[in-house]
Amino acid sequence: MGKLVHGVSTVGAVSFLLLTLASRRSQRARFYLNSILCVISMALSSSIGVVCGLVLSLFPGKRFNVNYIVARSFHFFMKPLIGMYVEVEGEEHLKRRPAIMVGNHQSSIDTLYLGRMFPVNSIIMAKKELKWVPFLGQFMMLSGSAFIDRKSRASAIKTM
């Protein structure tokens, strides 16, 4: 098993290096490299969320801060990758009163801008299938996310 893991790691590292070198000339290679880095950033942010979720679950009322930490860490990791600056107008209002933010995830940009503006003590509402996505699902369960069954209207309304 150890040799298999070592072999896969070596192939992965060499492939990543070749893709990095090729990305200087090829737009397609640059796209694949950025996609891989985006997935790594998401996994890293979710892993941070799992650790923070475990720690903050020991402190009553602090569990919802995990969403803030993960959202901001994802924004921190992704911003230099895509070179996009997000300016939030009226950000001071998010600190004073409740708000609803909607991201329909038509692109990865939604996650980036939500990561920039996500307030402290917030929860995430998501479809129940996300519970089983590695890293992401564990972080979401630990952070107190509300999972809805989109196929059952009554259940979705009850969750809200």
What is each PLM-predicted segment?
Residues 80-160:
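Soluble catalytic domains of membrane acyltransferases
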Residues 3, 24-30, 62-63, 72, ...:
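Arginine residue identity/basic-tract feature
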Residues 21-87, 138-139:
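A transmembrane-helix-recognition feature enriched in membrane-embedded lipid enzymes
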Residues 2-25:
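Terminal signal-anchor or tail-anchor transmembrane helices
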Residues 1-4, 28, 77, 125:
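Intrinsically disordered, low-complexity sequence elements enriched in Ser/Thr/Gly/Pro
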